[in-house]
């Protein structure tokens, strides 16, 4: 595993996050720095790297990611604060129109892209939707399973698939570059809670608590909303 580029010198506060949350985290920290003299050091990588460094480096103070994944990784937080909820959507390219998420099972949708249900949060949510809606068997031969959400979006943008299961954050600002997107009822998949946790063994406890407290402010909530949460 490639190690993350952790700060080499004394730091005010180190926040580690999955690369998929980079824009969200950057915007949150920018808003935070307007209210505080603390200047967090940011570290990004895949979530496997992030959790490993959080456990073993002794440098990471706060981890941002999906709560279920962080819990399974065995990280201990004191406290953990929700930033927002991820929203699963079905998106389609120009020239196509879907009136319901269930339309992905119709014959005219010949290719349906989705992230890996084993390794990707939104892939897991997508599988839960297909199972809950009773259409998993109807779509199994048309599924194109890829590694990540951005790959699904790329296929939708290029028109190489007729629809894709992705997240709202990734498609909400694409405008007329795609045909459209539709939210999937959140009752059809387990909640996707994106949040920040102050590690129980963090060295910068007071600074970390200050950042966690900021996440409950209107300014932080506005950032989360901007990113589709």
What are these regions (language model features)?
Residues 1-7:
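Bacterial N-terminal signal peptides
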